[in-house]
Amino acid sequence: MGLGGDQSFVPVMDSGQVRLKELGYKQELKRDLSVFSNFAISFSIISVLTGITTTYNTGLRFGGTVTLVYGWFLAGSFTMCVGLSMAEICSSYPTSGGLYYWSAMLAGPRWAPLASWMTGWFNIVGQWAVTASVDFSLAQLIQVIVLLSTGGRNGGGYKGSDFVVIGIHGGILFIHALLNSLPISVLSFIGQLAALWNLLGVLVLMILIPLVSTERATTKFVFTNFNTDNGLGITSYAYIFVLGLLMSQYTITGYDASAHMTEETVDADKNGPRGIISAIGISILFGWGYILGISYAVTDIPSLLSETNNSGGYAIAEIFYLAFKNRFGSGTGGIVCLGVVAVAVFFCGMSSVTSNSRMAYAFSRDGAMPMSPLWHKVNSREVPINAVWLSALISFCMALTSLGSIVAFQAMVSIATIGLYIAYAIPIILRVTLARNTFVPGPFSLGKYGMVVGWVAVLWVVTISVLFSLPVAYPITAETLNYTPVAVAGLVAITLSYWLFSARHWFTGPISNILS
């Protein structure tokens, strides 16, 4: 009994919890996620089945298989630089606030409140837009599945109205909010299931679809055919190619979820960065396989994009449907394959709400949101329950813009990519400028390459911000104008105005809750 009989038991905190306390926060959420669970949430939000399937038309229209095959690796490589820089910062600051907390720490005392404010609002609005976009895409996919199941566009199939689609969207969000009200241990299991579903789904579809197809593209076609027949008045090869990159960049986003889940992840200073990097890396590999497999079933691009085909112009749905119909005389197998994708999209939306709610919880914990005390409330299951339902409600309201104008909805959805990547870039640029000599890395460090990778990441975000703002059709009219710059400028104007007239007087950046 060498230490004496009055020794009391002292619980051992893991490295992530120790670091959280050093940063000024007490543990309020249940820390129960493994490194695989952390990865699974980001991987499920990236969800190559979701992003590629729902935006395949864009890649096919702008450059075809060449843009899809080569553009995916180009966008993926630069996105990995963004992810590596984020992972390094995450290792040093593993909190649910993620990006906005990083900005505050890296900007220094003078600029911390403003940097934190702008990063936080771009991040959370971008996340809400992602959820709105994903669940609306699922509602549209369900509509296409119903259309094909009832005979297709040319066989008297049922196509729901815009109000039906928005109703489905609302129902999906309601289910996602219910699921996210469950304990984190349950969400961890569902997240792991979602990751496995995405992995297996990609493997099955990338092999099955070209195998079943009676007409296959040649390898030369897949790797060299450049489609310029976009019907949108754009003829420049370079311009067409960069517009086609939008599919890839839209897909590989949302991996900041691993950072937002760090307060619920064991050894978060190590496993948070691993979650970010592995989610991006595995998504790049599996996404390319999915693109390649599907592209071997592409033989007539104009027909796939035509709104007069059975799926109403939904290219991948038409590919799946025709593959089975031409082989077996029935497109039922193709509809089942679309069901596999739909489940992946469902998981993607669910994980998006999980990430949204943790960001809202952390941002309100620091007093940045209206009615902050309400949104950072944690229930008996250690779940930020009010933030969950807030995220679902706002995402639903965002999708309501589709009833007024699809152009307005597309502008809002564009914030899902641009808003998030601007939020990604702010802490990185602070890391390589103001904090270049003061930043102290955590267990994961890029070492001497940190500055180079950081600058590459920043330049890539600037590049894609320009690309997403380019006109996508000529001549430019009110219907064809790309309203992305307007949407982003509007968000900047609102957040800066809020700051100048109100928040600068009371928002000081992240607030310690150790003593509360």
Curated annotation (Swiss-Prot):
<protein>
    <recommendedName>
        <fullName>Amino-acid permease BAT1</fullName>
    </recommendedName>
</protein>
<dbReference type="InterPro" id="IPR002293">
    <property type="entry name" value="AA/rel_permease1"/>
</dbReference>
<dbReference type="GO" id="GO:0015180">
    <property type="term" value="F:L-alanine transmembrane transporter activity"/>
</dbReference>
<dbReference type="GO" id="GO:0015185">
    <property type="term" value="F:gamma-aminobutyric acid transmembrane transporter activity"/>
</dbReference>
<feature type="transmembrane region" description="Helical">
    <location>
        <begin position="189"/>
        <end position="209"/>
    </location>
</feature>
<dbReference type="GO" id="GO:0005313">
    <property type="term" value="F:L-glutamate transmembrane transporter activity"/>
</dbReference>
<feature type="transmembrane region" description="Helical">
    <location>
        <begin position="33"/>
        <end position="53"/>
    </location>
</feature>
<dbReference type="GO" id="GO:0005739">
    <property type="term" value="C:mitochondrion"/>
</dbReference>
<feature type="transmembrane region" description="Helical">
    <location>
        <begin position="113"/>
        <end position="133"/>
    </location>
</feature>
<feature type="transmembrane region" description="Helical">
    <location>
        <begin position="483"/>
        <end position="503"/>
    </location>
</feature>
<keyword id="KW-0496">Mitochondrion</keyword>
<keyword id="KW-0813">Transport</keyword>
<comment type="similarity">
    <text>Belongs to the amino acid-polyamine-organocation (APC) superfamily. Amino acid/choline transporter (ACT) (TC 2.A.3.4) family.</text>
</comment>
<feature type="transmembrane region" description="Helical">
    <location>
        <begin position="232"/>
        <end position="252"/>
    </location>
</feature>
<dbReference type="InterPro" id="IPR004756">
    <property type="entry name" value="AA_permease"/>
</dbReference>
<dbReference type="GO" id="GO:0015189">
    <property type="term" value="F:L-lysine transmembrane transporter activity"/>
</dbReference>
<feature type="transmembrane region" description="Helical">
    <location>
        <begin position="70"/>
        <end position="90"/>
    </location>
</feature>
<keyword id="KW-1133">Transmembrane helix</keyword>
<feature type="transmembrane region" description="Helical">
    <location>
        <begin position="383"/>
        <end position="403"/>
    </location>
</feature>
<feature type="transmembrane region" description="Helical">
    <location>
        <begin position="406"/>
        <end position="426"/>
    </location>
</feature>
<keyword id="KW-0472">Membrane</keyword>
<feature type="transmembrane region" description="Helical">
    <location>
        <begin position="164"/>
        <end position="184"/>
    </location>
</feature>
<comment type="function">
    <text>May play a role in primary carbon metabolism and plant growth, by mediating the transport of GABA from the cytosol to mitochondria. When expressed in a heterologous system (yeast), imports Arg and Ala across the plasma membrane and exports Lys and Glu, but does not transport proline.</text>
</comment>
<feature type="transmembrane region" description="Helical">
    <location>
        <begin position="328"/>
        <end position="348"/>
    </location>
</feature>
<feature type="transmembrane region" description="Helical">
    <location>
        <begin position="275"/>
        <end position="295"/>
    </location>
</feature>
<dbReference type="GO" id="GO:0031966">
    <property type="term" value="C:mitochondrial membrane"/>
</dbReference>
<dbReference type="Pfam" id="PF13520">
    <property type="entry name" value="AA_permease_2"/>
</dbReference>
<feature type="transmembrane region" description="Helical">
    <location>
        <begin position="452"/>
        <end position="472"/>
    </location>
</feature>
<keyword id="KW-0029">Amino-acid transport</keyword>
<dbReference type="GO" id="GO:0015812">
    <property type="term" value="P:gamma-aminobutyric acid transport"/>
</dbReference>
<keyword id="KW-0812">Transmembrane</keyword>
